[in-house]
Amino acid sequence: MSPNVSRLCRWQIILVLVSMLTSTIAGGSPSSRFFLQPHDRVVFYGDSITEQRLYTNDVATFVHTRFPKLPVTFINSGVGGDKVGGGWAGPLNVRLARDVFPFRPTVVVVMLGMNDVLRGHPLSAYEQGYQLLVAKLKKHLPHVRLVLIGPSPFGDSATPNKINDRLIVMSRFVQRLAKQNGGLFVDFNAPLVSAMARIGQTSPKLASKLIPGKIHPGASGQLLMATALLKAWHAPSTVTAVQIQARPLATIRSDHTTISLLSRHAGRLTWTQQDTALPFPIMNLHAHCPQFPPISRTWTINSLVIELPYSGPPQLAAFTNPLAQQVLRITHFYRTLDAQTLMVNGLNAGNYTLRINNSIVGTFTQGQLAAGINLAKYNTPMLQQAYRTLRQVWRISSMRYFAWRQLELTLYASTANQTQTYVASPWVHVKPGRIDNTSAAQRAVKQILAGYSKLVHLQQLRLFHMMPALPTHYELSPAAGPNAHSGGK
């Protein structure tokens, strides 16, 4: 063998090994391109737009379903009314010391600016306050990775307005600040304005619902925000990608899944998949999602009122949210962030019914299956498991919100005369009022807070135990009826 051929063979072997390694990394664990890594602790810091817990829970749900084995925790520390210098929940020093630093975050995501604009603060004050915020984060958390977000827009249409013009100027400053401090900048303003313009061309009324009330984006608007953040984090587009050849019977492709028991009998194909990821459960596609989600839901049993943590809006099979549909369309969401493709080649002409775990997913033509279908659009067992994950993410955020806002803040928000103001709680019936720092009531609240902190931790462990994706059994058989249907979301 000549030296040139020998070198060529060595390079071919190296390329094959690199390809195998890349494929292994991509399945079920983040690649080096994805922003989050094992054991990251992510704190979302901001105002009421963050406090809504919509885009933050979308992001958390995406990460937990796309990377089921990735140990990452998410904490929402958004407070309504906050500015770069703080707000009613305390000045900046208090906010950071109580609501950020104790979690030892490796990633801090910041979005602030709306209240600074609405209260008429000059741009210079915003810039100085933001610089101080970043400096304190870097001093206390030397290795923190900063994600600075250009604030979401003001207004319920794409028509320019003075308030949003100021937000855009602030966003440009945030972009420069992120670059100066080695952080990542993500723009939330432009995607929402662009979406309002595109949807408004055919349905202005529908477009106005992206930001009801002009300040707080609804669930569809915040899905756009989550999409922008996930793309900036290099989130992978693929859930799974499967290609099966019917004749001769073979597995051609099995990205992010393991295929076993592939067989063909009397025109019927069957196989089993063990996926390493789940499709993304879109919270408001088949649900009426409140703009400001509650922290709990009430159940009445034999006149006994029980409060349980809010686990997201109920999914309604007969309802499809037209605004969510438009957002998915203009962002090409299923192609760019939620591709769960199944391709079957070599079938005879005709229609075929796909069943997963004995449940009918849909009936498809031979041509549709050869081109590939995106299972993320269908009500599959995998999507149902993903919705269970979504509900658990909401339970955790609701319990954390309750423990923090209705217990912890009563212990820390001291007034000038060293007393505490207690807020009425829907879970713990503490009488509202002012009590001193040494009272039995405050000690009781501390005990309850400690108990809820443990409960939140247990719920986080339960979330990880819900993973990974469960094995699924596929059956593709000739359809009895003459017509195919696409079904799906």
Predicted regions and their residues:
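Active-site segments of SGNH/GDSL-like serine hydrolases
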Residues: 114-115, 134-169
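Conserved catalytic region of serine esterases and O-acyltransferases that act on ester linkages
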Residues: 37, 208-214, 219-489
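Oxyanion-hole/transition-state-stabilizing segment in secreted/luminal serine hydrolases
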Residues: 35, 57, 79, 87-127, ...
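Bacterial N-terminal signal peptides that target proteins for export
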Residues: 1-14
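Serine-esterase "nucleophile elbow" of acetyl-processing enzymes
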Residues: 15, 26-80, 95-104, 225, ...
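Substrate-gating cap/lid alpha-helix
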Residues: 156-188, 330-344
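Bacterial N-terminal signal peptides
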Residues: 12-23
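Extracellular serine-dependent O-acyl
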Residues: 145-151, 168-207, 223-240, 245, ...
